[in-house]
């Protein structure tokens, strides 16, 4: 049976799409339509999802925010090496979570919190779920993001 065109053009977001220099769908591959059933609902990406590389030294911990407007194909799924963190938009800012999880505070200990052999460390979903995040009121999250963005912009101008 033919799948809707949207499913035939579903992109698979892998760790190689998620670099510290930025996020790009150019490296994404198309989903094999026969495997669509193997992806849980949580792996179908939504605007604002955090994508956290969760496997391997050198890639473990890299993070991006998914922007659905940059996906000309519509649908995308995260492969098993990318952990999807979906904020509740009315309560938690994706930008705030991105700034927190990308911070030195988290990144400096991420390998210690991962499991597995030396080269193939894995950041378990249970570890991500149990991570304690300081969560100020929503408006304060937005202020923190604005201040961080201003500081980063100031540094980049130098």
Residue ranges and their predicted role:
Residues 88-90, 94-106:
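Glycine- and charge-enriched low-complexity intrinsically disordered segments
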Residues 63-79:
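Short, compositionally biased
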Residues 1-15, 121:
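Extended boundary segments
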Residues 56-60:
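Short, charged beta-turn/beta-strand-edge "cap" motif at the junction between a beta-strand
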Residues 74-83, 92, 110-111, 115-136:
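A short glycine-rich beta-alpha junction/loop motif
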Residues 1-3, 16-52, 67:
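Sequence-specific dsDNA recognition surfaces
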Residues 108, 130-158:
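Amphipathic alpha-helical coiled-coil/heptad-repeat segments
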């Amino acid at each position: 049976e033919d799948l809707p065109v949207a499913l035939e053009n579903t992109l698979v977001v892998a760790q190689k799409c998620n670099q510290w220099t930025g996020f790009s769908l150019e490296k994404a591959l198309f989903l094999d339509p026969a495997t669509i059933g193997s992806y849980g609902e949580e792996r179908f990406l939504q605007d604002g999802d955090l994508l956290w590389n969760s496997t391997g030294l050198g890639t473990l911990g890299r993070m991006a925010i998914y922007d659905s407007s940059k996906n000309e194909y519509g649908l995308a799924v995260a492969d098993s090496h990318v952990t999807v963190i979906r904020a509740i938009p009315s309560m938690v800012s994706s930008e705030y979570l991105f700034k927190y999880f990308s911070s030195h505070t988290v990144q400096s200990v991420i390998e210690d919190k991962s499991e597995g052999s030396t080269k193939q460390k894995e950041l378990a979903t249970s570890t991500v779920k149990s991570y304690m995040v300081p969560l100020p009121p929503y408006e304060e999250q937005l202020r923190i993001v604005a201040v961080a963005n201003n500081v980063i912009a100031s540094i980049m101008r130098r």
